[in-house]
Curated annotation (Swiss-Prot):
This is Histone H1.3. The modification Citrulline is found at residue 55. The modification Phosphoserine is found at residues 2, 105. Keywords: Acetylation, Chromosome, Citrullination, DNA-binding, Hydroxylation, Nucleus, Phosphoprotein. The C-terminal domain is required for high-affinity binding to chromatin. Its main location: nucleus. The modification N6-(beta-hydroxybutyryl)lysine is found at residues 35, 47, 53, 65, 76, 86, 91, 107, 170. Belongs to the histone H1/H5 family. It is found in: Nucleus; Chromosome. The modification N-acetylserine is found at residue 2. The gene is H1-3. The keyword Membrane does not apply.
């Protein structure tokens, strides 16, 4: 009998631990589902303020009614609503017209709403500078037109080399032609001057013929 008594309390001990873990898992899953469901409070507040047509602004009580009508639990999330209002006022999306803190009336900031519309206009304007991108392609054609300049530079180099070689050859030939004819003319002129001198000596040879005729006179005896 003493052996069977301690076995009874040991069996239900593991059965108590298992249901505690299951309950904790279920509670965590439900909390995750609550956080994921629905948009944030700031979006709901901005929509409610934008939907109201009151010039003086929307009071906190009117905001809670609008949020409750949208299916938001106002009683549980009262602190979140107040924090959302303060953050929207600090960002500049809402303007507080009456009261201080979360207790007051609120309106949408028209400057912030117009500022949200301006970036769209900038994006539309940013689409226009795409035309200058096409215009930037045109300078590439101009850069391609610069390549003929290289071919123009190469051609004068080819022209200059034969021109200098031909010029030097012509100058050398002309110099040789000028030097050679001058001594030839000087040599011919003295030869012509020497030739008439022996022709003038011929009359001297005719004088002895006259003396021979004088010797024939003694035949008169």
């Amino acid at each position: 009998m003493s052996e069977t008594a301690p076995l009874a309390p040991t069996i239900p001990a593991p059965a108590e631990k298992t249901p505690v873990k299951k309950k904790a898992k279920k509670a965590g899953a439900t909390a995750g589902k609550r956080k994921a469901s629905g948009p944030p409070v700031s979006e709901l507040i901005t929509k409610a303020v934008a939907a109201s047509k009151e010039r003086s602004g929307v009071s906190l009580a009117a905001l809670k009614k609008a949020l409750a009508a949208a299916g938001y639990d106002v009683e549980k999330n009262n602190s979140r609503i107040k924090l959302g209002l303060k953050s929207l006022v600090s960002k500049g999306t809402l303007v507080q017209t009456k009261g201080t803190g979360a207790s007051g009336s609120f309106k949408l900031n028209k400057k912030a709403a117009s500022g949200e519309g301006k970036p769209k206009a900038k994006k539309a304007g940013a689409a226009k500078p795409r035309k200058p991108a096409g215009a930037a392609k045109k300078p590439k054609k101009v850069a391609g037109a610069a390549t003929p300049k290289k071919s123009i530079k190469k051609t004068p180099k080819k022209v200059k080399k034969p021109a200098t070689a031909a010029g030097t050859k012509k100058v050398a030939k002309s110099a040789k032609k000028v030097k050679t004819p001058q001594p030839k003319k000087a040599a011919k002129s003295p030869a012509k001057a020497k030739a008439p001198k022996p022709k003038a000596a011929k009359p001297k040879s005719g004088k002895p013929k006259v003396t021979k005729a004088k010797k024939a006179a003694p035949k008169k005896k």
